Amino acid sequence: MADQLRWDYLSCYGHPHLKTPHIDSLAKKGIQFESAFVQSPVCGPSRASYYTGRTVFSHGSTWNQVPLPIGELTIGDYLRQSGIRTGVVGKTHMRPDLEG
């Protein structure tokens, strides 16, 4: 997942100068969205929705640094069950739920 990336900064969407060959290759083999939306204008809750497949108010992470509840399954949990190694790189504005 690439986030914080403007659609009009990709050559597959017609940027006249920037070249993004790897993302263009993924777009050619997959799906290009012409209209999409996020669950929250705040990045942390929006990422939590991507991770869980749930709306902001159903998973409870309503602001940056508000953790997902312990036991909340994410895409990483499901991928690991299939033997796929996962990791997170970069800022996520997510924290572990230390209080449980």
Tell me what each language-model feature is.
Residues 1-100:
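Formylglycine-dependent sulfatase
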